Amino acid sequence: MIVGLIGVVEKISALETHIEVQGVVYGVQVSMRTAALLQAGQKARLKILQVIKEDAHLLYGFLEEGEKILFERLLKINGVGGRIALAILSSFSPNEFENIIATKEVKRLQQVPGIGKKLADKIMVDLIGFFIQDETKPMHNEVFLALESLGFKSAEINKVLKTLKPSLSIEAAIKEALQQLRS
């Protein structure tokens, strides 16, 4: 699995960026924001998400870990694929997007190409608990992702997250949340 690339940027286009790494040129899909920060002929270090489908092997590149985490979370939403997730990251920084979700600005989300009212509403509902605005944020995000990977719904997880003590370790919080969800 490819998780990162360090090489020289050969070509930057709206569809794909080419990076040469020790004689091999990789086609990497990046957001417009990332593309704007890259320069042809310059060395770049990208965090990579490799997506293997029936008909394609895709590489998505990110300069920041926060962008990659948000992209991965967006892909988990039914109806959001790589194209729409990149369009969101091209339109908003992760912090801007977090504020849009926190303030429930559906109209701003609908300005992204490919996102209509129905999908914007779905994204809002699915991500409302992903961004927690307090000191327990790192713990809540880890617990949220762990519970989601076990098949629990966002609404159920958000309800339980509100009851967890901030002093719990991530492991203890997951155990406590599982007990509450299974009761």
UniProtKB/Swiss-Prot annotation:
Q: Which residues form a coiled coil?
A: none
Q: What is its main location?
A: cytoplasm
Annotated segments matching region Domain II: 64-141
Region annotation Domain I: where it falls in the sequence: 1-63
Q: Which GO terms describe its molecular function?
A: ATP binding; four-way junction DNA binding; four-way junction helicase activity
Any one of the GO CC terms:
Holliday junction resolvase complex
Which locations, inside or outside the cell, does it occupy? Cytoplasm
One of this protein's GO BP terms? DNA repair
The UniProt entry, under HAMAP family, shows:
DNA_HJ_migration_RuvA
What assembly does the database describe for this protein? Homotetramer. Forms an RuvA(8)-RuvB(12)-Holliday junction (HJ) complex. HJ DNA is sandwiched between 2 RuvA tetramers; dsDNA enters through RuvA and exits via RuvB. An RuvB hexamer assembles on each DNA strand where it exits the tetramer. Each RuvB hexamer is contacted by two RuvA subunits (via domain III) on 2 adjacent RuvB subunits; this complex drives branch migration. In the full resolvosome a probable DNA-RuvA(4)-RuvB(12)-RuvC(2) complex forms which resolves the HJ.
Identification of the protein by name:
Holliday junction branch migration complex subunit RuvA
